[in-house]
Amino acid sequence: MSFSDAVLVARRDFADRNPASKLHYDEARRFMPGGHTRTVLTHAPFPLAFASGQGATLVDVDGHEYIDLLGDYTAGLLGHSETRVLDKVKAALDNNVSVGGIHPAEATLARLMCERFGIDRVRFTNSGTEANLMAIATAMMATGRSKILAFIGGYHGGVLYFVSGAAPWNSPYDVVLAPYNDAAGTERVIAEHGASLAAVIVEPMLGSGGCVPADGEFIRRTFAAARAVGAVVIADQVMTSRHGRRGMLDLLGSEADIVTYGKYIGGGFSFGAFGGRADLLDQFDTSVETGRAAKGEMVISHAGTFNNNMASITAGCAVLGEVFTADVAEAHTTRGDEFRSMVAGVLARHPLPVCVTGFGSMMSLHACATAPTDIRGVAARDNDLQELIFLGLLQRGVYTAARGMMNLGLAHTDDQLGRVLDALDDTLRAIAHK
């Protein structure tokens, strides 16, 4: 049986096992285009609907249990029931839901982030997308320039989408694209557009682009070339700040001018932030007596009703202050590297063109023989085989992204990870024997 024929069979089996999810999907499509409001959740024949979650386990509306190896695309690092976060959020919300003013927790979280990640200043947003938009605005105002350099395969939010080139629905910035993990090619693009470049924005590892880590030399040469022409370096660490004590960029031996954050720091609540050098972030200083306005200088306005919302800010304080400390982050990165090696060991036992890429606790399966180093390698994979692996893992109680992404969480037990490896082994064996 060909992979394409096997996919049709697997989809029918999936539909037969999940009638309640199908019913929910059909009803939801009456009111929401596509049946949901998050495009990445789409897969054939229809996405699962979940009823509950506890620890690292999800339960769908048909009653099936899954080991959650997706972790909400890195936002669910803590699992589904971290009481050290939830108890503090509940207590804060009992006191006040929306103060309409400043509150002590936001200064606490700002201090925790600056000390943890080695940044001078930070401001909060509602998402990583907003954080990246504000980081770009910061760079444009600081330089007086308008052009942005991004990378083919990069993703910085729903309106900063470059996974398959610049999406036509993107925010209307003047963007030039450079090849990821190609230092010489990037240097040429920067040299060509240098006089008009406000910023270079880059992920230390392509997230939506397939968990493809950057080469350290590529990052260093890109940053040096950007600074040589006066452009601001923006590192999108919305996903990768989870790695090591200060984020993946630090482990690569580089430092950006502005860094964006999000995902797990909100403890499951919406969160984003952008921070970095004081001279850049102080463009937002509205202090009446000592700020930029008092000196007759331009001040950037940064509004947002929920930028400092009580739930997200309180959760962030608990996440960085108690749960995901620097020591825990360092150990978790090591555990992720070890688990990815185990995954590679399982793959090596089967005669299928499948590999794994990633860094620390983030990784992705690819239906191709050679590990991709850029988005072209990711795009070259066998889509039918990719889907068979995804559906096969679901059938065996393991929830991943349809595109192959897997993220290790704090709630995963060694027993659960062993069961994941067994499920992957059994899935690949079944595919190879079709």
Annotate the PLM regions.
Residues 108-202, 206, 217, 337-340:
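PLP-dependent aspartate aminotransferase-fold enzymes
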Residues 13, 319-344, 376-383:
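Structural signature of PLP-dependent enzymes
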Residues 254-290, 308-313:
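Active-site PLP attachment segment
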Residues 336-340, 350-388:
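Conserved PLP-binding catalytic core of the aspartate aminotransferase-like
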Residues 324-326, 392-434:
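PLP-dependent enzyme catalytic core of the Aspartate aminotransferase-like
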Residues 3-52:
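Active-site-adjacent loop/helix segments that line or gate small-molecule/cofactor pockets in enzymes
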Residues 203-216, 230-252, 258:
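Conserved PLP phosphate-binding loop immediately N-terminal to the Schiff-base lysine helix
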Residues 65-142:
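Glycine-rich loop-to-alpha-helix module at the N-terminal edge of alpha/beta enzyme cores
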